[in-house]
Design a protein with these regions (language model features):
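Charged DNA-binding/catalytic regions of mobile-element recombinases
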Residues: 1-230
Length: 230
């Protein structure tokens, strides 16, 4: 799924708690059932079992130097932590978000599940479009960002590793900056959960290829290391 073939630090006590939400596939009718017992599957188990069939979405805000607020929308595939799509707008809407899903997921290459929060921006237009694509939505509980851990981790990485170190002037400058960062994220930034590989896997280079060289990325905020012949 997508064109991609992080170490996730999460709160253990939260991810091991019983799955209690009606939106989880396969557990309808088990919540508050006749036995009064919660279902046995945990949230972590659901995420692990469906990693190959699951994408998540989220918005985050970025203020500019003139105090204008920009909204960034991301779509992330869980299996390889691969960013499938991002876009920036100053006026998000349900229709706009729905169009982003179409651009992120080409026809015939859609996941089974979409994990998202309950933000009002995901209105009827968004839900209708996603349903029409054959995707089943899984909603997190109110005020529970830990239930969307991969998207939250990605957004945290963007802030810590990029946005906290720069000044955003306008929408164009933010797009350029995010393009640079996401190129680094996909092709160079290693993830412990992927065996210290980036989302787009890199082959191990043997010593005979040459000396290790340092290549600046994201305007010098980060670096990539490769072997190259002298």
């Amino acid at each position: 799924m997508g064109n991609c073939s992080s170490s996730l630090a999460v709160r253990q006590r939260n991810l091991s708690s019983p799955l209690l939400y009606r939106s989880i596939p396969g557990h309808r009718g088990q919540i508050h059932g006749s036995s009064g017992k919660p279902p046995s599957q945990t949230w972590r188990t659901f995420l692990n079992n469906h990693a190959k069939q699951l994408v998540s979405t989220d918005f985050f805000v970025v203020p500019t130097v003139t105090f204008r607020v920009l909204y960034v929308f991301v779509v992330l595939a869980h299996e390889r932590r691969c960013l499938l799509h991002f876009n920036v707008t100053s006026h998000p809407s349900s229709e706009w978000a729905a169009q982003q899903m179409v651009e992120a997921l080409p026809w015939g290459n859609v996941p089974r599940y979409l994990l998202r929060d309950r933000d009002a921006i995901y209105g009827e237009s968004f839900r209708t479009r996603v349903r029409g694509m054959g995707i089943r939505e899984v909603l997190t509980a109110p005020q529970s960002p830990w239930q969307n851990p991969y998207a939250e981790r990605l957004i945290g990485s963007i802030r810590r590793e990029c946005l906290d170190h720069v000044i955003v002037f306008n929408e164009s400058s933010l797009r350029r900056l995010l393009n640079l960062y996401f190129t680094y994220y996909l092709r160079s930034r290693t993830h412990l959960a992927l065996g210290k590989d980036p989302p787009v896997s890199r082959p191990v280079q043997p010593p005979e290829l040459g000396a290790v060289v340092e290549l600046p990325e994201v305007g010098g905020l980060h670096h990539r290391y490769e072997r190259r012949a002298a």
